[in-house]
């Protein structure tokens, strides 16, 4: 009962890494359940049920992609592979409907998170 309550109270926050189902997808968009780096703040995510962020992958072809930022080594079944944040694929998802859940990595450390934001800003040029 306590675990169910904890999950019911959970709301993703900026810098969290979560699991989310990216389906449906089209073209070169990511599909299926993947890690996702949250960019939007907890208050926004709670109020709107949306989460804005970037998908993550261990697909090796991203090593040559200037917009895929390597953020460390994967763990678990993907141990030994590099984790990439796909800065060129910002997305918003209804995290409640898609039954998002916390990823075992929990949160991206400050330094790589700031690098991800800098690469994203090179693309969308907010500031």
Q: How would you name each of these model-derived features?
A:
Residues 1-127:
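Conserved functional hotspots at enzyme active or ligand-binding sites that engage polyanionic ligands
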């Amino acid at each position: 009962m306590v675990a169910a309550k904890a999950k019911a109270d959970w709301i993703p926050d900026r810098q969290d890494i979560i699991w989310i189902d990216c389906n449906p997808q089209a073209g070169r968009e990511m599909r299926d359940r993947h890690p996702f780096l949250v960019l939007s703040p907890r208050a926004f995510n709670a109020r709107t049920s949306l989460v804005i962020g970037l998908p993550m992958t261990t697909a090796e072809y991203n090593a040559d992609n200037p917009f895929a930022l390597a953020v460390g080594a994967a763990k678990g079944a993907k141990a030994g592979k590099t984790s990439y944040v796909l800065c060129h694929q910002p997305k918003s998802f209804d995290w409640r409907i898609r039954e998002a859940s916390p990823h075992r990595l929990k949160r991206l450390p400050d330094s790589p998170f700031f690098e991800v934001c800098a690469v994203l800003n090179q693309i969308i040029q907010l500031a």
